[in-house]
Structures are given as C-alpha cells and as structure tokens.
Amino acid sequence: MKKIILIITLVLSVSLAAQRDVKIELPESYELGNIILALTEYGKTDPYDVQKVSPYYDEIMSYFEPVKDHPLLKKVNYSRKDWKKFLGFRTDFYAFSFDGNGLLTRDFPFNSFGPKEVDENLELINDFVKKSNYRAFYKNHQQFYHSLIANYKEYYYINDTYAFLDKIAERPANEGGKKYIIAISPLVGGQNCHRDINSSLTVDFPNIGEDLILGNLKDNLARRILDNHTVFSEIDHGYVNPVSDKYSKEIAANFNLANWDKNSGYPGINSFNEYMTWAVYDLFIREKFPKEKTDSLSAIYHKVNIRRGFIAQNLFSEKVIQFYKKHKSLDKLYTPLLQWTKTTGKKISQPSVVNANNKDFKKVDLSNVVVQFTEPMKKTATLQLRLFEYVDGKETNNTVFIVKNPVWSKDGKEVKFKLDTSYKNFELRFYIWNSIAGFYSQNGILLNPDNYLLLSS
C-alpha cells in the first residue's frame, strides 16, 4: 500500500479529520484520462458523461487545440453503448503514474471492467502526453485543484454522512486498516462508480457539483443537498451491502427482480442494494435538513433512479422511511421491508403511452391532443411536458410546456389537452428528470421515462 501512495507523483490530496481516514485526491494520471475523454468527439457532444463547466473546460479545449487530431482521440472515442470501455478507461488511470522519465506506467493491478483500454493504448497515451505537454497543464492548475480538494469535505457533508451511517448501521467489519479514497475530477459527469482496489483500499470515483467547481460553497442549499447524493450513495454501500449479505437468502426469496428491476444491469442482490442505498440517502437528508423541502428533492432523484431501471424507487423509499421511524436501525427494518417487497412486487407494473415511440411524425390537432395509457393514471391538475422541435430531421429547439386543466377520462387511461406551440414537427416527452412533477399510475409507478410521441401540427 505504501508503494502505491509513494509512486503516484504530483497527486494532490488532503486527509479529512472526520470519522474515517478519508482522503480526497485529484491524481495527475486520473485527470489525464478525464481530459482525453473530454477531447474526443463523444466527450464534446454527449451532454452527460463529461461535465463542461467553464472556465476550466474552456481552458482545456483551448490548451489542447494543437493535438485535437491526435490518433488517440479517435481510438478512444467511445459511445454510450461502450460505457464499460468509457468508464474503465477513466477509472483504470488511477492505477498508473508517471515514472522518472515522464512515462505513464502501471503501478498496481486494477481493472474496473473487462476491457483494458489504458494498457492497450499506453503507447498512444504517452505520445499524447508528450505532444500536448499535458504535465505542464496539470502543474499550472494546481491551485484550482487544491481548492476543490480543500472544500470537498465541507461541501459534501462528509463528517455528517459518516456520523449518520454509524448511527443507523454497524461500521463495516473489515474496516480496520482499510483506506478509503475519493478520486475527483471537475470533468466527471455521469457514470460514477465505487471500487475495491484491493483488500486494503476502496476508491470512489464520483462527479462533483458545479457550485463546488465554481467556489460557490454557501449559496443554494438545495443544490448542495442534491449534489451530496452522488458521494453519499457510494459511501453508504459500505454499510448497506454487509447488512444485505446477512439477509441474502431472504432477499433472493422476497425481492423478485422481474417485478422490481427493468434492465438496470444490476443482478440479484446488487439491484436491491441500489434501491436501499438511495433510500438511506432519503433518511439522511430528512434528518440532516428538517427545514428543507427534502421530499421534493427526493422525488427528483427517485425519477433519476427509475430511469436507470429501478422502477419503484419512490415506493421503496417511502416504505424504508416508514419502517425506520419504528425501528431506528437499518438491520432491524430488513425483515418487515422484505415481507413488503414480496407482496408489493406482484402489483408492480410500469405504465406506458399507447403507440409510443412511433417512427414517423403523426398529424395531430393541437387544440385537442389525445394521449392514452396502458393503465389508469393519477389525474393531475396540470401536466408537465417537454417538446423537442425537429426541422429537416434535426432537433433545433426544446421547451418545457405546462398544460393547465387537462381533461382526464373517468378511468384515468386517457387525457386530452391543448398545446400552444409553433413547432411543426416535434417530439413529445413525458419525463423531465429535474422536476418533482410526473405521470404516475394509480399504483404510484412512474410512466416509462423513455416513452415519446412524434407529432406534427
């Protein structure tokens, strides 16, 4: 372990005097991987996987302009379907550092996923480092990196997070002597991950909030609470997973993946743990921020997790909150919770829009738009929709549209409304991730977030 720490050169880190020996790092090698991905065509055009906060992002685009055509950038130009290669490329850089000759070399075994993208492209990476003069860029931004590291603990409530988790669950039994590191980069957007590097080291690779990047530490508490979710839901895996392991047989018998999970990619107990870690976050913010409208903040993240495939996150979290009020212990609520998941799972069904995801634009009367659903929906007084305009087959604009006084059918399976828009051809979407509003079935399940209708006026 000492070898790992000593070998990594120019690693900016600061220990947190918290309940744990937590270290925040912004390693030179890790930032190199993030910058390379940001410079690819996918990194520049995808709105999620690379965070593009100015002025840092703009400085990267300007500084590395002379090497924009370097062959490495085409070689590692991954797409959304190549997410394992993308995320593996980013995180595997953590196992590398620069040697005395300025060459990136592997320090220890670590491969986040199957593809060994860094190893296979090492020669091109070192050529890119040399021709771009990357190490000078990293050195010149140390003051900025230091500010992110120094402010991270306060911004993300690290001390409070551990204090809460220690209260509701036992400290992980294998924690003694184990080091926990949070590796950060201002460029990480989506695709966070939590990895056990070896038996003595765990590293989280979360994104960081825009306010932290810009140094806005005191304003917008709601935004900070939302940002806290990313690191909290990784840290609490260390508490949730061991408890789940104790109940692994009960989870297998009472948590039917076919009912609760829609293609999340998390098998068996791992899917349950995702549900639980997000529910524990809801417990934390309710207790830590009693004066804030935490139910609204939770609703936003429930929708995010639902889109990941955990289609009943809102119902699951509500039940965890209910049982926690009685038991005040994570361990003790598992038995009643799993009894509930067994009976409730049989009733879970994700509603959809009838004839959704059509391939051609369908003519519609904007004064009387009719949308039908596969099952009865909750009859809301307003509808929140997102419209994407298409001109010559390309998306040109989009807007959020609020419909007042929609007309619902008696059974809740149809709604009629007027759309006041100048768009000729547009895509009608029913899912807006950062809004508490949404289309929910009468059983409380969110409408399939990937449903849309192609319409024409």
Which residues make up each language-model segment?
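Bacterial Sec-dependent N-terminal signal peptides
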Residues: 1-21
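Post-HEXXH active-site segment of zinc metalloproteases
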Residues: 241-269
